[in-house]
Amino acid sequence: MAIPEEFDVIVCGGGSTGCVIAGRLANVDENLKVLLIENGENNLNNPWVYLPGIYPRNMRLDSKTATFYNSRPSKHLNGRRAIVPQANILGGGSSINFMMYTRASASDYDDWESEGWTTDELLPLMKKFETYQRPCNNRDVHGFDGPIKVSFGNYTYPQCQDFLRACETQGIPYVDDLEDLKTSHGAEQWLKWINRDFGRRSDTAHAFIHSTMRNKENLFLMTNTKVDKVIIEDGRAVAVRTVPSKPIGDSKVSRTFKARKQIVVSCGTVSSPMVLQRSGIGEPSKLRAAGVKPIVELPGVGRNFQDHFCYFVPYRIKQDSESFDAFVSGDKEAQKSAFDQWYATGAGPLATNGIEAGVKIRPTEAELATADKAFQQGWESYFENKPDKPLMHYSVISGFFGDHTRLPPGKYMTMFHFLEYPFSRGWLHISSDDPYAAPDFDPGFMNDDRDMWPMVWAFKKSRETARRMECFAGEPTAFHPHYKVDSPARALEQSAEDTKKVAGPLHLTANLYHGSWSTPIGEADKHDPNHVTSSHINVYSKDIQYTKEDDEAIENYIKEHAETTWHCLGTNSMAPREGNKNAPEGGVLDPRLNVHGVKGLKVADLSVCPDNVGCNTFSTALTIGEKAAVLVAEDLGYSGSELDMEVPQHKLKTYEQTGAARY
């Protein structure tokens, strides 16, 4: 299909949010011409997308489905540069993310203090996009006939129940629905953005774009195309200039597409502010320094960068336990078995993400008493009067989430943590008017001292969970904090007996130890009165007591390992132009997502969030997409039932061995 030069609506960015907007608007009126422009490749029937169990491949630094941005070095990360990825494929993060179904707390949206954006007002839109594929006691807060599917997947690793039992012993109760918008302390079996009918990832491109393009002729798609800038004339956005996704030699190849009615920028938290800045919207002095003529003065563009700070901690598990380690590390038999099962039935290890259970937690009064004064003050000002806000998240991954070439052989589980509401803030700005140039970027990871105590606290909590799990078999010491050798908190390696099982009878150096820094767990048990062994579970009856030196070791570990959770937001904050408490350096958008000072231009993606949300952010991206579609449609004069904008169902019929098409 030839691409015209003029459209009614242009959506810049085919990510999680942009696909919702373009798909919905194309279904409001068949005469409304909509163009969706995406920098990455088309994801249609791409097995790296629709097979849930191979998602770690998209996280590798050589991935073609993500762009990796390097930050300035940071003293808060022990001199490291942070690496912040952004999806680079149609569907955005929904095509490559962890597929973890979590939702924001009700107070999160209310705290944005934007007209039309309270949780009560957004809940119908949250229900609109989802089909909740499990028994439900909270039917008033979930949806059951939307295009995006939510389920447990079609496989569950045994670490699920093991983890939940261990959490109960720590006073973290099992909760049937931790995503009810109000519960902030509990453990649950983790739901996933997976269609249980087919064992396939549920992403916004297949749900909103491919389904619509099969049935409509008014939706146009361009992939492998980068948005350079929005052209503004007499205070109105009138066109979009594009370039190829990668430079072609020294030539300057560009195209310009006119928009008769509306332009929506939805390029993501990193790219959307850069598009605005290249368009002349931002801090004038910085725009001039980058070679851009200022048009609209909005200093808040690129400011208020936020993320969730995560870290992964591996633990050894017993050799008779199940994990995905063999599959992801290249075992041909394990891979063939998993692929054969999925293509035959849509079930098995490839029909899950391996993240089977997790917690949202708040500290007790006794735990808060151990926090430093800085965090205690932060707690009082931000959390204390909002009981629906969790402080930390952690979950169990049924294998080692990382590079297996750097790890001793064996089976593992990983505790995956992230801080729900960091106080730290960062920024980014274009370094030139070249659309291919990397930004000047400081994400601000861990630059607020109030963020350290909860990160250390969660490490201790999850470590106690791991030690109480039946499958627990030790701690790979090289991947844990480096405590003093005589510390009771020191990491304990797997037992000599488990080492023999991993190594096999022909291994000549198993259990050959140099020095005393790494102690096998069996030897430690002989001197540990708190350890009890039963036929059912290994139980450590008392929590580890940490010294100040131990805490310092954990803090240093956090500085060396804290990283993005792929959840960045805030760089085009929805706030008054002069700013407010959420965006003190100035807002970028009004409550209808219009860019201050420009007509016909909206921004709609996670960059609009003025404050953080306590969840994996895909659910928020979907909510923003649904809201933006309604706002655009209303601005175009549609109302009532026209705003339903129902998209056609994306049909899946057969499992095909080709791995190319499953309809």
From Swiss-Prot:
GO cellular component terms attached to this protein's record: peroxisomal matrix
Residues that bind FAD: 8-39
Residues of the active site: 567 (proton acceptor)
InterPro entries hit by this protein: FAD/NAD-bd_sf, GMC_OxRdtase, GMC_OxRdtase_N, GMC_OxRtase_C
Entry GO MF terms: alcohol oxidase activity; flavin adenine dinucleotide binding
Signal peptide positions on this chain: none
Keywords, alphabetical: FAD, Flavoprotein, Methanol utilization, Oxidoreductase, Peroxisome
Presence of keyword Oxidoreductase: yes
Any GO BP: methanol metabolic process
PROSITE patterns noted in UniProt: GMC_OXRED_1 (PS00623), GMC_OXRED_2 (PS00624)
Recorded metabolic or biological pathway in which this protein acts: Energy metabolism; methane degradation
UniProt main location, coarse: other
Annotated motif Microbody targeting signal, positions: 661-663
Compartment(s): Peroxisome matrix
Domain of life: Eukaryota
Cited function: Catalyzes the oxidation of methanol to formaldehyde and hydrogen peroxide, the first step in the methanol utilization pathway of methylotrophic yeasts.
Entry's free-text remark on domains: The C-terminal peroxisomal targeting signal (PTS) is essential for the efficient targeting and import of AOX into peroxisomes via the PTS1 pathway.
Protein name: Alcohol oxidase
Source organism: Candida boidinii
Encoding gene per record: AOD1
